[in-house]
Amino acid sequence: MTTYNIKSTVITNRDATPKVLTDAYVSGGNLAASQGYVQTFGAADAAGTIYRMCQVPSSARVESVKIQNDALATSAAVNVGVYWPTFIPVGAGLSTSVAATVINTALFASALSVVAAAKPTDITNSSGNNSIVNQELALWQACGLASDPGIDLDVCVSVSTAIQAQGYIGLKVTYAK
């Protein structure tokens, strides 16, 4: 077996000649957070229901995504992903037809059970879609967009298996900018 001395992107950039600047959202950036909560309606919350929880700048790198919830019945499950905002700012260079549509429905979590009440739980890569490599990228890149739209994107919880009880769901996204 051989031993190696392998460098991450940050260390490789530091050691390069000439030095390569690492984006502040990867090393040395400031952390910020956005959070929100909703109350479910109970039996009316069918698969496909979307809860718009918070907004994150498209150019930010997501540090963590934490969800907490009340017990929401016998088979309830949700996805946590990224959507276009419900309002596209004038001058953003985007068609208003993308407003409120999905970008990546399960970037952070897929079919996550919300049957039992849960304290804040980190789901940054619960789905397997937000891989270790993606976690060093800006949100727009991690979502698979071709370019940075330069606006805040919505982080949403979408119902994948009907929620049959009334209760609260909360989400907190910490990001570097």
Where are these regions (language model features)?
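Surface-exposed, low-hydrophobicity beta-strand/loop segments enriched in small/polar/acidic residues
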Residues: 2-177
